[in-house]
């Protein structure tokens, strides 16, 4: 029996031009040293002082951990809500297949925020829904993303790889603090480039991205403006393996309903076993949980009535998803799920403008933390390309999964044979890694 892997790749690009952008860099958070008590008339013995200091430090450490955990949860929640807002903006222009990475977008824009200050920085925070975190320490946001990145990369079962490039014009003066902070928080690799030779720069950058994405995106750049000074590229590669595998032996060509009148034939995978699901009576939709190895999950949202999938998008929030998860019950089920591959590219700067992030794309951008010429810089382009592939390729899985269905019981069936939404979460952090919609599984 084969494990079904899901390959998901997201690449985000931010391009900076010399035309109009800031101030001292954020410092890493420091915990103030505990102060000695001086109000006592009699000096406490040295051992007692040490005990008190240890207790104080231990209490501070516990408070720090609790605060950090709450901040991470808030970050995940706000990133998800940002993702749902972005979904609605994309949906106004595209009613077909869709996939993008809210996590990747937030990660890249937070990295860019290291070079911004004043209203430029504030707009990015507000647009990403991150102003609610109200950081009490400098460098909080990048520190949270750094911790999350490191946690995800240590989880080898998850199969998530993330990286960042800064392609910099050879004579462009980037501040050393921006270099150092980008490396510290986002492990950014800086690559000098001659953008005046646009064709050579395009070829070299495509080579880098092709190599890092393992050939999944051989050509990210179609053209390069010779006036470009800096291009930031973030990529996320996710190759997940289902915890409950689909056996390719049972994959058959079946009918998928595009709408009330049109159907197509697609390879439909079949799985039987214990699945968690719920039915939302308010929205009349099935929500199915398909777990990956490494503590990640794909949520599949399938409307009961054909054609209602777009209407649901207006109501998607983190609170709604949390309600679905709380109401889920695990039971023996049969699941039919189509194989599909999506390859989507979006010019995100226009959508981000609509979400209130405007200044960084204008001559009023303040990027003076990025470069000494920061008030003559603006970001010209933010592009995200995401690829997802769900099929039966993979490693051997444990046999006998079908034995969980008893001979005398007809299990419930969920057949994903019409347009649906999917969300891929990392469960420990609650971070929404990818969000998408499949209207036609045979189209990219």
Swiss-Prot record:
A GO cellular component entry from the record: endoplasmic reticulum lumen
Post-translational events: Phosphorylated by FAM20C in the extracellular medium.
Q: Please list where the region (Heparin-binding) is annotated.
A: 136-153
BP GO terms, sorted: blood coagulation
Which residues are recorded as modified (Phosphoserine)? 56
Annotated stretches, region: Disordered: 24-65
The record lists glycosylation at 36, 180, 197, 295
UniProt keyword Disulfide bond present: no
Molecular function via GO: heparin binding; serine-type endopeptidase inhibitor activity
Q: Which InterPro entries match?
A: PZI_serpin_dom, Serpin_dom, Serpin_fam, Serpin_sf, Serpin_sf_1, Serpin_sf_2
Another remark in the UniProt entry says:
Heparin acts as an important cofactor, producing 20 to 100-fold accelerations of SERPINA10 reactions with factor Xa and factor XIa.
Q: Into which family does the record put it?
A: Belongs to the serpin family.
Name of the protein in its database record = Protein Z-dependent protease inhibitor
């Amino acid at each position: 029996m084969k494990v079904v892997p899901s390959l998901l790749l997201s690449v985000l690009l931010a391009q900076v031009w010399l035309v109009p952008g800031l101030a001292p860099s954020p410092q890493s958070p420091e915990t103030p040293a505990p102060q000695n008590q001086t109000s006592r008339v009699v000096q406490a013995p040295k051992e007692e002082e040490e005990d008190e200091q240890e207790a104080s430090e231990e209490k501070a450490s516990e408070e720090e951990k609790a605060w950090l955990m709450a901040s991470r949860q808030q970050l995940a929640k706000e990133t998800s809500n940002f993702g749902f807002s972005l979904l609605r903006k994309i949906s106004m222009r595209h009613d077909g297949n869709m996939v993008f990475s809210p996590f990747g977008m937030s990660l890249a824009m937070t990295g860019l925020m290291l070079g911004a200050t004043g209203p430029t920085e504030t707009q990015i925070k507000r647009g990403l829904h991150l102003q609610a975190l109200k950081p009490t320490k400098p460098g909080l946001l990048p520190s949270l993303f750094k911790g999350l990145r490191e946690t995800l990369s240590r989880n080898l079962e998850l199969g998530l790889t993330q990286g960042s490039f800064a392609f910099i014009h050879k004579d462009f003066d980037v501040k050393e603090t921006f270099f150092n902070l980008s490396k510290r928080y986002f492990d950014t690799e800086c690559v000098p480039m001659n953008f005046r030779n646009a064709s050579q720069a395009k070829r070299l950058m495509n080579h880098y991205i092709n190599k890092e994405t393992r050939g999944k995106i051989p050509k990210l750049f179609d053209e390069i403006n010779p006036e470009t000074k800096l291009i930031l590229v973030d990529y996320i590669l996710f190759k997940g393996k289902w915890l409950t595998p689909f056996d390719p032996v049972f994959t058959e060509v079946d009918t998928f309903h595009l709408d009330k009148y049109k159907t197509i034939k697609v390879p439909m995978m079949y799985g039987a076993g214990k699945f968690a699901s719920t039915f939302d009576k308010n929205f009349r939709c099935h929500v199915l949980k398909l777990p990956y190895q490494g503590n990640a999950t794909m949520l599949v949202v399938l409307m009961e009535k054909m054609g209602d999938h777009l209407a649901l998008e207006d109501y998607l929030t983190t609170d709604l998803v949390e309600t679905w998860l709380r109401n889920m019950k695990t039971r023996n089920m049969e699941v039919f799920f189509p194989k599909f591959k999506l390859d989507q590219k979006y010019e995100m700067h226009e959508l981000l403008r609509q979400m209130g992030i405007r200044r960084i794309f204008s001559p009023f951008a303040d990027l003076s933390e990025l470069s000494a010429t920061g008030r003559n810089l603006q970001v010209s382009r933010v592009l995200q390309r995401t690829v997802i592939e769900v099929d039966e390729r993979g490693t051997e899985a444990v046999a006998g999964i079908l034995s969980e269905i008893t001979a005398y019981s007809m299990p419930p069936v969920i057949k994903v044979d019409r347009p649906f939404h999917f969300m891929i979460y990392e469960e420990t952090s609650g971070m929404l890694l990818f969000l998408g919609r499949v209207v036609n599984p045979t189209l990219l």
